[in-house]
Regions:
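Glycine-centered loop/turn motif at secondary-structure junctions
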Residues: 3, 103, 151, 169-170
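Short, structural beta-strand-to-alpha-helix junction motif
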Residues: 91-93, 149, 153-157
């Protein structure tokens, strides 16, 4: 509908969803360029060959020897493109200005909302994957209950839950990546905020407890 020639995804969620590459930012730019003929991730040299080995599509790795190497990579993948889709809700002003400077004849079109709508439509394979994730989350919850006792610190409960989920993920997907699985566990006053961090507070009798288990595989939880 947007009549774009290609798309440059830059966000964690879109790059991970469309390429299965969960990058680690550390001040470097990443991307996933999709054209009618190819899908290619753009990664920094610090990642070595991991993006090429583990992710969907092709891969271009750029070095830090020159500051504009990222944009050179984008240029090599978007030759002849007049209308490029980008994520307006993710690209900051600095990057947008650099894109406009590097590609003066290119028109940039917002594809943030359309790409989100595409991610909302789940395939049968995705549904099967999510079903496995809920099973593993239940295992993490049971481990949390197992570890919860008066006098036990929050972090010990969370660690037991997380370790149990990681082991089950490794068993379920022997060749998968084990990254970012975690547990939110709060007790007592610490339950007053949904996103309060885990602390070393010890559980007391009569405490309200809050639990969220996040088994993370391929960007799903």
């Amino acid at each position: 509908d947007a009549k774009i020639d290609a798309a440059l995804f830059t966000s964690y969620h879109c790059i991970n969803y469309y390429s299965d590459f969960l990058f680690c930012y550390f001040g470097r730019r990443y991307g996933f360029v999709v054209t009618p003929d190819a899908a290619t991730s753009i990664s920094a040299g610090i990642d070595g060959g991991q993006p090429a080995r583990r992710t969907f599509g092709g891969n271009v790795t750029y070095t830090d020897w020159q500051k504009d190497n990222y944009f050179h990579a984008v240029r090599t993948l978007t030759g002849g493109v007049k209308r490029l889709g980008i994520e307006f809700d993710h690209i900051n002003i600095d990057t947008l200005n650099l894109l406009k400077s590097e590609f003066p004849g290119m028109e940039f079109v917002d594809i943030a909302a359309p790409s989100m709508r595409l991610r909302m439509i789940k395939s049968a394979e995705e549904i099967a994957h999510i079903t496995q994730m809920t099973r593993i989350a239940d295992i993490g919850g049971a481990a949390c209950v197992e570890a919860t006792k008066v006098g036990t610190p929050e972090h010990e409960v969370a660690l037991h839950s997380t370790a149990t989920m990681v082991r089950e993920i490794a068993k379920t997907w022997p060749h998968g990546e084990l990254l970012d699985t975690w547990t939110w566990f709060q007790s007592g006053l610490n339950t007053d905020g949904a996103h309060n961090p885990v602390t070393s507070r010890k559980i007391e009798k009569g405490d309200i407890l809050s639990l969220n288990c996040f088994p993370m595989v391929a960007g799903y939880y």
